[in-house]
């Protein structure tokens, strides 16, 4: 097969080029060695730019042409003018450029990764709305792909990830495909894929976790650690990222910035794929949350934004929107009596919500018993309040509490999915200092009693609640019960005031602001001149 000429290659790449340009006699084309034989359709050996990039290439070729006859020069001038007009009219085709349009999929055939939008990697192109879709190029109308990186080290990271996913679906429908992945568990080898188990062990042994948290905080400690870790897991993590072919990447975990950003930088993709961080700690947060190469860092509070600035991020990288919570918390709340009837609660007695997290941890039973005594008026022989207990996945605790003969109305639930309804049925909440639960309680206007926290990332949540007049802190079940009894009795004004303070501090629209800003980043970043094959 003879080697293709420049004009034949251009014709193959874009049949719409002016016939006059393609019929230029070979003496008018710059002298150069023969071009290599065209590769097979699945090869990424070379690429032919489309749009304005082609005009630049042709301009260089024409200017490289030396002296010729006057007639030939005149003809070349006319042909070039015609071609320039063509470029102005037809050369501005653009398409989203992310992993998919860069041809970085790991599937065979060049039609895409085979997962989500973009087809199943069948190779070759097709005609779409009269435009030729060339191999390796994502369809302009295909959904953009969002990849959320998280880890199940505590429930807050997954909850934030699912909230962002739900908001994307609610706001943009089929325009986006959203994938949530535990990057370390799913895409790294042992022992790195044991991160959730290691975290669970450490937080159960407080001194060990405290030493780990504060010992890795200095940059001179964690940066070399990430650099060394990248040596062992970069290949696997890169494959994990390419599997999803994202157009934008969101990290909701402090350990999901450094290694992925090193990979994107090594592949030259930092300017093409926005990488963003959504910080899910309300006040104190580990320094690994902040990386100077992120496109955007979404902070839940002014305190966190100050830490981001101190870590070296620019003000243009930082947005203070609040903590993302499930979109269902933004919907209008149903009447309290209706919610209480559905939950089997008394319609008139004030209610306290006692939570133990997803695993039902903490002094739940002791606190529930203390509340049962404090909310019963021995003189009148009647209850002054009621209790709704959420035990999570702790079935033994659920069974024990359900077997108790209570003097006050008590409803015991296991793992619940509609927390907004449970909160809407109650007047205050007792919980550990998890940021997600605090943010949700504030949206519902519930005064908060914090009964514990994890050293490090949750320590700052206690003053965040107390100093803003939204609640109190105590580890004593008896003292907690007394606070609730006072709120339901002689100190009801304090309960109302704290409810108002919580509503003032709440940011119910945070998740929607985040996804709309992400949408704008994708719109700005991913539209570049289209290429016919992998970059």
Curated annotation (Swiss-Prot):
Its EC number is 2.4.1.46. GO terms for biological process: glycolipid biosynthetic process. GO terms for cellular component: chloroplast membrane. It catalyses: a 1,2-diacyl-sn-glycerol + UDP-alpha-D-galactose = a 1,2-diacyl-3-O-(beta-D-galactosyl)-sn-glycerol + UDP + H(+). It is an enzyme of class 2 (transferase). Residues 1-109 form a transit peptide. Its main location: plastid. Transmembrane segments: none annotated. The keyword Acetylation does not apply. It is found in: Plastid, Chloroplast membrane. One of its GO terms (molecular function) is 1,2-diacylglycerol 3-beta-galactosyltransferase activity. SUPFAM superfamilies: UDP-Glycosyltransferase/glycogen phosphorylase (SSF53756). Signal peptide: none annotated. Keywords: Chloroplast, Glycosyltransferase, Membrane, Plastid, Transferase, Transit peptide. InterPro entries: Diacylglyc_glucosyltr_N, Glyco_trans_28_C, Glycosyltransf_28_UgtP. It comes from the Eukaryota. Involved in the synthesis of the major structural component of photosynthetic membranes. Belongs to the glycosyltransferase 28 family. This is Probable monogalactosyldiacylglycerol synthase 1, chloroplastic. It comes from Oryza sativa subsp. japonica.
């Amino acid at each position: 097969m003879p080697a293709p000429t420049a004009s034949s290659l251009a014709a193959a790449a874009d049949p719409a080029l002016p016939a006059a340009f393609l019929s230029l006699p070979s003496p008018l084309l710059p002298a150069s060695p023969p071009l290599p034989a065209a590769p097979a359709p699945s090869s990424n050996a070379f690429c032919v730019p489309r749009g304005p990039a082609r005009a630049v290439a042709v301009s260089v070729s024409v200017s490289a042409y030396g002296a010729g006859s006057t007639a030939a020069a005149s003809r070349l001038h006319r042909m070039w003018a015609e071609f320039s007009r063509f470029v102005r009219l037809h050369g501005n085709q653009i398409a989203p450029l992310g992993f998919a349009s860069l041809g970085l999929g790991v599937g065979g055939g060049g039609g895409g990764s085979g997962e989500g939008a973009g087809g199943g990697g069948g190779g070759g192109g097709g005609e779409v709305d009269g435009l030729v879709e060339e191999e390796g190029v994502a369809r302009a109308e295909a959904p953009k792909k969002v990849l959320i990186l998280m880890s199940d080290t505590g429930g807050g990271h997954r909850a934030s990830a699912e909230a962002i996913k739900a908001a994307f679906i609610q706001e943009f429908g089929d325009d986006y495909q959203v994938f949530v992945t535990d990057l370390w568990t799913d895409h790294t080898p042992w022992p790195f894929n044991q991160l959730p188990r290691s975290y669970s062990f450490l937080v159960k042994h407080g001194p060990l976790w405290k030493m780990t948290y504060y010992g890795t905080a200095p940059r001179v400690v964690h940066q070399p650690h990430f650099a060394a870790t990248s040596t062992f897991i970069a290949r696997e993590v890169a494959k994990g990222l390419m599997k999803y072919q994202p157009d934008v990447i969101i990290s909701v975990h402090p350990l999901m910035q450094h290694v992925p950003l090193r990979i994107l930088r090594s592949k030259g993709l930092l300017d093409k794929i926005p990488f963003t961080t959504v910080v899910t700690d309300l006040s104190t947060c580990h320094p690994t949350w902040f990386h100077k190469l992120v496109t955007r860092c979404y902070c839940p509070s002014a305190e966190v934004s100050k830490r981001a600035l101190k870590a070296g991020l620019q003000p243009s990288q930082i947005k203070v929107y609040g903590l993302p919570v499930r979109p269902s918390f933004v919907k209008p709340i149903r009447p309290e009596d209706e919610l209480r009837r559905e939950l089997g609660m008394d319609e008139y007695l004030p209610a306290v919500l006692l939570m133990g997290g997803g695993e039902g941890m903490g002094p739940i039973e002791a606190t529930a018993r203390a509340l049962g005594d404090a909310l019963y008026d021995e003189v009148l022989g009647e209850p002054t309040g009621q209790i709704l207990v959420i035990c999570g996945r702790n079935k033994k605790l659920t069974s024990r509490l359900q077997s108790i003969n209570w003097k006050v109305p008590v409803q015991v639930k296991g793992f619940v999915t509609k927390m907004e309804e449970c909160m809407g049925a109650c007047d205050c909440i007792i919980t550990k200092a998890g940021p997600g639960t605090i943010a949700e309680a504030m949206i519902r206007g519930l005064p908060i009693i914090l009964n514990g926290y994890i050293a490090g990332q949750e320590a700052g949540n206690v003053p965040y609640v107390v100093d803003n007049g939204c609640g109190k802190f105590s580890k004593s079940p008896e003292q907690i019960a007394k606070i609730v009894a006072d709120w339901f009795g002689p100190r009801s004004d304090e309960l109302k005031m704290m409810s108002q303070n919580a509503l003032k501090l709440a940011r119910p629209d945070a998740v929607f602001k985040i996804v709309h800003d992400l949408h704008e980043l994708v719109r700005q970043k991913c539209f570049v001149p289209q290429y016919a094959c992998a970059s």
